[in-house]
């Protein structure tokens, strides 16, 4: 499965965090065994081994971080947040403090703890001011915290470093529509050229008043694509149709499309979590859907 390849890569990227204080001690051996089990898809075994590593060296903050990463990849967000909180309690050096707040902020967002996510993202950005324009995650959190002015300003800054992303234009629109009305949001829709992801340019046209929901869905289903690619294209169509209907205050249609997006949330990274959190915060029923063929 491509998912496991990705997760194994992520685990290897973070492996240096997990180096035990005693390189010949039991903790490192548990970490190595946990990483191996994870790569083989033996997730329960990996979690047990990571827990044993922490038990062997409970004051080694790197092991708690490793455990948090493992829980995060397995979408166990409450346990991930708890592990990152333990890292911070062990008083890491400045850079690791910031990185841990970023990781915990993402976990908090995925738990629907929006204000807590913003607080953690703020700590990260204070430590790394140059990351501010890159931080679209904080912009999305601002939307769900009803801090719409801060939201559209965040996406305006993000536009300076990510010029061809329809999603940035849409989230800017959504925040501006809530702050100043949909008429002004349409007038100030950020122009995007060159987002090659289907159906994102059609989504942009919809928000600009130059397309329709039916055309967005047709574009997502077009081209003879099947399987995971079709699911991904429909996921983005459903998510942004749901957000469009939220902006136009059509609650029934919003719920329909957000529900469809949330139904496959686990397959679509952070934006999948956005769909799921949106459904949870608004108590939107999530249907069971069959895999796209």
Question: What do these predicted ranges mean?
Answer:
Residues 28, 62, 95-99, 133, ...:
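Start-of-helix register in tetratricopeptide repeats
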Residues 24, 58, 92-95, 129, ...:
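Short coil turns that delineate tetratricopeptide repeat
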Residues 52-53, 86-90, 123-124, 157-158, ...:
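Canonical positions in the second alpha-helix
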């Amino acid at each position: 499965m491509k998912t496991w390849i990705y997760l194994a890569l992520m685990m290897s990227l973070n492996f240096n965090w997990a180096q035990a204080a005693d390189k010949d001690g039991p903790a490192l051996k548990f970490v190595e065994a946990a990483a191996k089990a994870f790569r083989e898809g033996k997730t329960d075994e990996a979690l047990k081994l990571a827990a044993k590593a922490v038990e062997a060296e409970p004051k080694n903050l790197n092991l708690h971080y490793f455990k948090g990463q493992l829980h995060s990849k397995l979408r166990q967000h409450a346990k991930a947040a708890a592990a990152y909180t333990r890292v911070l309690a062990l008083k890491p050096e400045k850079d690791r403090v910031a990185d841990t707040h970023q990781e915990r902020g993402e976990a908090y967002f995925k738990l629907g703890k929006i204000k807590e996510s913003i607080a953690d993202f703020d700590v990260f950005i204070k430590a790394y001011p140059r990351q501010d324009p890159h931080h679209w995650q904080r912009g999305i959190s601002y939307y769900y915290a009803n801090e719409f002015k801060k939201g559209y300003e965040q996406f305006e800054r993000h536009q300076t470093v990510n010029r061809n992303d329809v999603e940035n234009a849409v989230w800017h629109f959504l925040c501006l529509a809530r702050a100043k009305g949909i008429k002004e949001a349409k007038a100030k829709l950020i122009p995007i050229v060159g987002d090659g992801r289907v159906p994102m340019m059609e989504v942009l046209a919809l928000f600009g008043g130059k397309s329709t929901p039916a055309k967005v869905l047709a574009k997502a289903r077009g081209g003879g694509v099947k399987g995971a690619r079709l699911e991904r294209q429909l996921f983005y169509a459903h998510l942004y149709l749901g957000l469009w209907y939220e902006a136009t205050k059509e609650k029934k249609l919003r719920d329909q499309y957000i529900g469809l997006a949330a139904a496959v949330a686990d397959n679509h990274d952070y934006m999948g979590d956005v769909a799921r959190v949106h459904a949870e915060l608004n108590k939107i029923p999530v249907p069971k859907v069959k895999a796209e063929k």
